[in-house]
Amino acid sequence: MKKLRVLVLMHPSLVPPESREGYSEKESFAWKTEYDVVTTLRKAGHEVRPLGVQEELAPIRREVENWKPHVVYNLLEEFHHQQEFDQHVVSYLELLHAKYTGCNPRGLVLSRDKALAKKLVHYHRIRMPGFVIFRKGRKPRLPATLSYPVIVKCLTKEGSLGISQSSIVDNDEKLAERVRFVHERLEDDALVEEFIEGRELYVGVIGNRRVQVLPIWELVFENLGRGSVPIATE
C-alpha cells in the first residue's frame, strides 16, 4: 500500500492526545472518533497530521500548500460555530484542488435541508411519511392530509438533536408546545411528519461514479420504559 500524507480536519477541542492511556472512557468519549481515525491511519502506515479548525481557513491553506497532503480527511461538522457552514470548508478544499473525504458541497447542502431532501426522494417515487414545515414564528396547524400521531423534528439540525420521547405528539396542544420548543430553544424551523413506528436501520454508502453500499446495521432498543417509543434520541 502506498504511504499517504493525510491531513485530518477536526474541531480544535477534539484534537486527540497521542495515547488514551490515563483517560477514562467518559473523558475520551468526546474525541474518540478523532482518535480512532488518526491512530487507524497511522497503523496502516500513513503519515497523519491532525489540524484543529474553527474560525480560520488560512491554516488549511498553509497545510495544503506547504505539506501537500495526498488527501484531506474531513471530520468537521461545523465551521465558525455554525453547522450549516461546514459546506463552505469543503468548497474551499475544492478551490485548493485538494482531494478530500466525505460529501461534496452540493451533497451537504441537500442533506442539510430535510424538506428539500424529502422532496427529491419523493420525485424519484420513493415512499415516505407525509410532512409539513412550520417556519419560525408561524403557529402550527396540522393540514388535513396529515393525522396524529406525528413527530416534530428540527429542519436543519443533524443526527437526533432535539428529538426525545416528547417529540411524538397526538394532539394540537402538544404539537404547538413541541413546535415552540424547536423554534425557541433550538432556533430552527420545525419539520412535522407522520410518525411510523418501525426498525432503525443505517446504511453507509461510499464512492463517486461507482457506489459501494456498506453492510447494514441496526440500532436495537432495549430496556425501554413503559410507554416509550423506539426512536433514536439525543
Q: Positions of the model-derived regions?
A:
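Structural detector of well-ordered beta-strand residues that form the stable sheet scaffold
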Residues: 72, 101, 129, 151, ...
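Short, glycine-/small-residue-rich phosphate/pyrophosphate-handling segment
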Residues: 112-132
